[in-house]
Amino acid sequence: MSKALKVGLDGGPYALAAGPDGAMWVTLAHSGEIARVTETGEVAVYPVAPQARPSIIAAGPDGAMWFTRAGDDRIGRITVDGELAEFELAEGSAPFGIAAGPDDALWFTAMTSGEVCRISTDGEVTSVAVVGGMPSMITAGPDGAMWFTINQGNAIGRLETDGTLTVRELPTPAAGPVGITATHDDAVWFTEIGADQLGRIPLDEAIQELELPGKPHAVVADPDDGVWVSLWGADQLARVSGDGEVVTIDLPSGSEPHGLAIGPDGAAWVALECGFVLRMPN
């Protein structure tokens, strides 16, 4: 079993994703930067723009990392060598979630304009669906569609690459869904930060909900079974098995855990907005 690794990182670590280079790439929302963190804790920081507010980051099909810039309405791209590019969006769109799709493109949500959009690896942006309700995080589902949370619409959206949209309302009022991930059991899991619950949709079946106090924020699939969840309001991580068994891990007070990702070795990483990234033992 490997040991836990705690890496100090100023600038408000918010989200992170594993890159094709074996490192973890982190958005620094407060300072407007992107950081690269190796499995041994070595750090490199790349300035983007002070007002950019980098939010969610994902590995693209082109070998680069792509991220949303909610503060200045842009999509950013950074190569593993640190070369940056940006693609301007409509003013006030507030891009947030982003994920690689099955079509060799990136898909992202625009919270303020209420859109789900596609951006090709050469920067061509297409608005595919206008859903309203503040679409938040997005993931590629096991069925070839993009699934996303609609935070203020209290729903989960499913968008096929041809633009076919399905919206499913949540059974709990004002649940405030945020994080979302697809798992190897052909299901989609999501967090309900307003209801202190974790949701699961086995594709075409009924929505399932599990009580999970602590303001669950992000969720990521565990390669072995189940999911990891950041409990932002409780300064905890939760490990939830496929059959719903919950184990919580306490973090220091004031940690503000947000984004989660799985490293190349299967270990879970979490971004702590207080100024650290943490790699869990595996």
Curated annotation (Swiss-Prot):
Substrate binds at H217. It is an enzyme of class 4 (lyase). Its EC number is 4.2.99.-. One of its GO terms (cellular component) is outer membrane-bounded periplasmic space. The lineage of its organism: Bacteria, Bacillati, Actinomycetota, Actinomycetes, Mycobacteriales. It comes from Mycolicibacterium smegmatis (strain ATCC 700084 / mc(2)155). It comes from the Bacteria. Keywords: Antibiotic resistance, Lyase, Magnesium, Metal-binding. Inactivates the type B streptogramin antibiotics by linearizing the lactone ring at the ester linkage, generating a free phenylglycine carboxylate and converting the threonyl moiety into 2-amino-butenoic acid. This is Virginiamycin B lyase.
